[in-house]
A protein has these predicted regions:
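Hydrophobic residues in well-ordered beta-strands that form the structural core
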Residues: 58, 167, 207-208, 258, ...
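Acidic/histidine-rich catalytic cores of soluble enzymes
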Residues: 70, 109, 228-335
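A short helix->loop->beta-strand "cap" motif at the edges of active sites that frequently abuts
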Residues: 163, 254, 336-340
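Active-site groove signature of glycoside hydrolases
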Residues: 198-224, 252-261
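Short acidic/histidine-rich active-site segments
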Residues: 341-347
Length: 368
């Protein structure tokens, strides 16, 4: 692919982005074997603040209230969002590299949410969903010619600011575990064109969901013992989908990741099952500190997933678990010598920018 694209005007920029991304991630192990934990503090040299900040990534979802949205006359903007935009301004994803540089000094990487891609004034960049009565605008379509030009503009802005994409948190591909094979294959198709987009902007990893929040079959009691046959076909389909995507991801040079995010993969054991069955270095975990069903999963779930992660972790403070011990979560990363990127995802109410800054400080202070 590289040889065929040398004539592209943006290829030098993409090489620049890829070189930056590999620098931090290269030292991380790609194996999936659980290892014993040694005392990190005894073995590792304490890093400077600037060195720690190079491991951090801004999170566009955390400040999505500040982004320009499609105008809907029947849905006026809430007063609290208007106040935030008066304070920080309104912007698009094209502005996010500069926002990251200016708002979080020292942070050079970004975690970009899929629903914020595109120019909301240009419908040609989006899918069109036809109903009996109307055509509704859907998700950003990275394969559209106008979208490819948009992504090149994003690359230019990243190069000019020195702030580049590490990861795409993607909600666009759906139904990867669905029992309807037509829907599942469509989800795979969408994920592949997004992997191409991730490659275009120089991201090294991309999260894809297994399915919607409703897919979480529960056990039933049979002969006095819990049994859950209902979940098996969903797991089987997820495994097949991620096998195909991992092969495609390897060719693109972008890792496909599974986050504890909704439904089937809200349980870390299901993520481990999928990853072990796929058994491909281009398919790994991207754990989130807080996306758990209950409080006892907060730290134990992270310990289960972190050996399978080399590219991205979401450091989250969330209203569901407002008292999450961020330092304890980071100690788990330290113990496993995690060297991938850490995206700061604040979702605990109030001012999202100030909340992100505080969370960033908490994570950096706990890193070694």
């Amino acid at each position: 692919d590289c040889n065929r694209s040398k004539k592209s005007l943006v290829q030098p920029r993409r090489d620049f982005l890829k070189t930056l991304s590999i620098g931090t991630i290269g030292a991380a192990s790609m194996g999936f074997t659980f290892t014993s934990i040694e005392s990190s503090e005894k073995k590792q040299r304490l890093r400077t603040r600037d060195e720690k900040l190079k491991q951090m990534a801004s999170n566009s979802y955390a400040v999505n209230q500040l982004f320009k949205r499609r105008a809907y006359s029947q849905r006026p903007e809430r007063p609290e969002i208007q106040q935030l935009k008066e304070k920080y301004g309104e912007f698009t994803l094209l502005d996010f590299p500069a926002f990251t540089r200016d708002t979080y000094p020292g942070v050079k990487k970004m975690d970009l949410w899929s629903s914020l891609f595109g120019d909301v004034t240009d419908d040609s960049m989006y899918t069109h969903i036809k109903t009996d009565t109307q055509v509704r605008i859907g998700e950003f379509d990275p394969s559209a010619p106008s979208s490819k030009r948009y992504l090149d503009r994003l690359v230019s802005n990243m190069v000019s600011t020195g702030v580049t994409a590490a990861h795409i948190s993607n909600n666009a591909p759906r139904n990867l575990a669905d029992l309807n094979d037509e829907l599942r294959k469509e989800g795979i198709r969408v994920a592949k064109i997004w992997l191409d987009a991730a490659k275009q902007i120089g991201a090294i990893s991309m999260r894809v969901n297994t399915g919607g929040p409703q897919i979480i079959p529960a056990s039933v009691i049979e002969d006095g013992y819990p049994r859950n046959e209902e979940i098996v076909p969903y797991l089987r389909n997820a495994i097949e989908s991620f096998k195909e995507l991992a092969d495609y991801a390897g060719k693109a040079g972008v890792k496909i990741t599974i986050e504890n995010h909704w439904g089937l993969v809200a349980n870390p054991v299901n993520i481990i099952i999928i990853l072990n069955e796929v058994n491909n270095p281009y398919c790994e975990a991207s754990p989130d500190f807080c996306n758990w069903e209950h409080e006892y999963m907060l730290y134990h779930g992270l310990e289960i997933l972190i050996p399978k992660a080399t590219s991205m972790v979401h450091a989250k403070r969330w209203t569901r678990f407002p008292d999450v011990d961020i330092a304890r979560c980071v100690r788990i990363l330290n113990d496993y010598k995690y060297k991938g990127y850490i995206s700061v995802e604040y979702e605990a109410g109030g001012d999202p920018v100030e909340g992100t800054k505080k969370l960033l400080e908490d994570v950096v202070n706990a890193l070694i």
